[in-house]
């Protein structure tokens, strides 16, 4: 890619720093769109997804996914799924998004749910 946008440059910086700090821990990857928010725990060594949650899940689907309350709900659901999978320590991958608003709400709820990062 000859011309990277500011977002793409930031995403590369974040991912490079995560690889250096991961130390074998799974990555909590977050993606935010205008309507929804998605989060998943990824084991990069094995290349598998350990747990996932989003505002498109059946239990949450009727509500809007573009609020901090919905993001917090996704964080709680992901933390519960991570506990079920036996994961407590993760590396938070904000993926180029600023740590503010819905991203911060999801992270705080995941921490309250028992994930450490």
UniProtKB/Swiss-Prot annotation:
InterPro entries: Ribosomal_uL18_bac-type (IPR004389), Ribosomal_uL18_bac/euk (IPR005484). GO terms for cellular component: cytosolic large ribosomal subunit. Disulfide bonds: none annotated. Belongs to the universal ribosomal protein uL18 family. CDD domains: Ribosomal_L18_L5e. This is one of the proteins that bind and probably mediate the attachment of the 5S RNA into the large ribosomal subunit, where it forms part of the central protuberance. Part of the 50S ribosomal subunit; part of the 5S rRNA/L5/L18/L25 subcomplex. Contacts the 5S and 23S rRNAs. It holds the Pfam family Ribosomal_L18p. GO terms for molecular function: 5S rRNA binding; structural constituent of ribosome. One of its GO terms (biological process) is translation. This is Large ribosomal subunit protein uL18. Keywords: Ribonucleoprotein, Ribosomal protein, RNA-binding, rRNA-binding.
